[in-house]
Amino acid sequence: ATEDSGRTLGLDQKIAVNEKADQLKLEFSGTAYAHFAAAMKAKLAVEKGDLELAAEELQWSLDNGAEKATEIIIRLRLARVESARGNTELALEMIQGVDSGAHKSAYEEAKGDFYIQLGDSESAFTAYEAAVMSNESTSPVSRNILELKIGQVRPIENSAEFDGVNELAGDDDAMSEDIR
């Protein structure tokens, strides 16, 4: 976690954040503040490398009635945590069929990442293409990252294209023999 100035929180500050987050969850469990507190605790847990605690905090939020907009973000974060824990199939199941609204691009990109982890390049390509088509971000960096991912999994569409390339290469060899 960082402060607005970009400095990293110290250990004492992280402990204080966790204590306040626990208090918010306990005293105001039905509010958005409690869900944001759980998300912050999950973020701190990920930074510490405690993916189990991160998953518990995010699951708490889902189990305790997060509003739809918050639930969409929490579900995606939980799926990413589960994937990092090695539960990639579960992660994919968690986000399949979800009406992700304005977060469709992020969901599709995550699906692509999960498919890559499962060794399914074709499905990853389809998901990344869907992410680009629904990209709610105007950030060129975001779009460029998606384009790089697409380039890594783009299927070979037609082997005849490569035959044509080989024929051209053969012609080059013939031309170089004529020159000699």
Task: Tell where the protein language model's regions lie, with residue ranges.
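Solenoid-like repeat scaffolds
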Residues: 22-30, 60-67, 96-102, 132-137, ...
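Conserved small-residue packing positions in alpha-helical repeats and bundles
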Residues: 1-5, 42, 79, 112, ...
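Short extracytoplasmic
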Residues: 1-32
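"A position-specific structural signal for the A-helix of alpha-solenoid helical repeats
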Residues: 40, 77, 110, 117, ...
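Alpha-helical adaptor scaffolds
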Residues: 14, 32-106
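Alpha-helical linker/edge segments of TPR/alpha-solenoid repeat scaffolds
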Residues: 43-52, 80-91, 117-126, 150-169
